[in-house]
């Protein structure tokens, strides 16, 4: 099986599933049908409390286990295809932020590969065995860009700025005529979690109310909430201020957004879609939003299949 897993700081994404980047140990065994995994004798269940930000995700096994959990979900969904196969061969496609890709790619690959040894685990108290036949590491954000690049003919532009508003960081990279510019790749430590903290503090200070991240998401997505209009209005004001500051910071980095085509990707970009439209008026340039939280995963697959086709021709 070919399986892609996007290991975000806030959410884990696979082809068919999205869940929080959080796990916790459960002392009791996983029950039949319970959403949890047992690996090396330790029981883990999903937790909405995300993992503390890790610059290097290979520091410990948590992202390995979260990835295994994502794989388990996909294996269960593909039950008819894998039934009776014993050890299931898996080609794993994962990604790293643009700023970390060059220096961490090999280490991240080895983190999952582990000499291709068979991996035994229980998911929902059901046994599985997999072996990684291959592990490919791709560049996040650029992978999402590839989904729309051909359709929108972005390769014809001299400057396309990809902005990935993620959980802890905002990753960006410049693409010129379809080619990534290695000197214009970096991360800004101002991801959407920064916005959550600002809004939480501001609302608590002015209205003595506590908004958690789900509350803020619901407000910014304009879902029905029980909060007063003044709370909603203030939340949007703070989100707009955050976005204005974020986009303004690119000029300090030597990037004039007015002279680029911007492509927004990532869950934070989707959350701020309406505000991006409102703020973008001042830039008077083209922009696109990839409105798909699983875009990176699909981009991983697109690149892998292209590599496969290329190798078959040689």
Q: Model regions: which residues?
A:
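Conserved AAA+ ATPase "sensor/coupling" helix adjacent to the nucleotide-binding pocket
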Residues: 202-206
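Short, basic interhelical loop/turn and adjoining N-cap
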Residues: 207-211, 215
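Short, acidic (Asp/Glu-rich) active-site segment that either coordinates a divalent metal cofactor
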Residues: 171-174, 184
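Ser/Thr-glycine-rich phosphate-binding loops at phosphate-binding pockets of nucleotides
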Residues: 165-171
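Nucleotide/phosphate-binding catalytic cleft detector across ATP-hydrolyzing
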Residues: 1-160, 179-193, 214-217, 221-264, ...
